[in-house]
Amino acid sequence: MVEFEIVKGDITRFPAEAIVNAANRYLEHGGGVAYAIAKAAAGDPREYIRISKEAMREQLGKDHIEHGEVVVTPAMRLEKHGIRYVIHTVGPYCGGIWDEDKKEKLRKAILGALRKAEELGVKTIAFPAVSAGIYGCPLEEVVKTFKEVIDEFEREAGSVERVYLVLYSEKDYERALRAV
């Protein structure tokens, strides 16, 4: 059984074996949680961008990520918190508009990261609210989609035991709890 828990905290310090980065398709890590993770992992975000782009070319053979594809990079300085991997995924850009196409792209982004965690053999994985920040998707819809995808993923899960949705602000944490 895969347990899903919504928690308040800083994903860069959250003690899961893998954390997910809500990245843009070029792994630029220029703002939001992507910048915070890059800075915490490498000290210099530009260095983590270089490492991420190199990993993307090695793992995918191209210079961008599609919805559902993921890239794994080392946790580097995050290892002191028990984090072993950073899994980069790309959610949809909503700009405040939510529809079935956006939901399907988010489902692919979440499922891609979960399947990669399974492949890596990790027991715990922590996600930020992918696409709910800078990308402007409604938080409540993002949370509901997370819950649905995790319920479906449970049928294929082997090593993954716990999935966390980590919200940084108290307000978002409370909104997320009300959504499920």
Swiss-Prot record:
Q: What top-level branch of life does the organism fall under?
A: Archaea
Looking at the record, the residues that make up the Macro domain are 1-180
* Residues in the signal sequence: none
Under the heading InterPro entries, the entry gives: Macro_dom, Macro_dom-like
The protein depicted here goes by the name Uncharacterized protein TK1890
